[in-house]
């Protein structure tokens, strides 16, 4: 199987998000990379499902809460930006202050 760099990056996000969700299900609080991976994964999948950029920007702030992450993590993540593939092409999705 030959994957392009963009496809490899998406696959790494999926693996990181899966690991983070497993840790979360064990009751562990998420660290910075785990939180970013989950948010990124949910945004990419939302785009694939046909949601709009505006909808994803709003949805991105509801994926994780302060209770889900380690202390200080919300303050470390100011923006999450991902390039997602929508039915009408690739677009940049930016979520400001995603953990509230």
Swiss-Prot record:
Subcellular location as annotated: Cytoplasm
GO MF annotation: an example: urease activity
Principal EC category: hydrolase
InterPro entries: Urease_gamma, Urease_gamma/gamma-beta_su, Urease_gamma_sf, Urease_subunit
Reaction catalysis annotation: urea + 2 H2O + H(+) = hydrogencarbonate + 2 NH4(+)
Source superkingdom: Bacteria
Pfam families the record matches: Urease_gamma (PF00547)
One Gene Ontology biological process: urea catabolic process
EC number(s) per entry: 3.5.1.5
Principal location listed in the UniProt entry: cytoplasm
Record-stated family: Belongs to the urease gamma subunit family.
Subunit (UniProt): Heterotrimer of UreA (gamma), UreB (beta) and UreC (alpha) subunits. Three heterotrimers associate to form the active enzyme.
Family matches, as NCBIfam families: PRK13241.1 (NF009712), urease_gam (TIGR00193)
Protein name, UniProt field: Urease subunit gamma
Source organism of the structure: Pseudarthrobacter chlorophenolicus (strain ATCC 700700 / DSM 12829 / CIP 107037 / JCM 12360 / KCTC 9906 / NCIMB 13794 / A6)
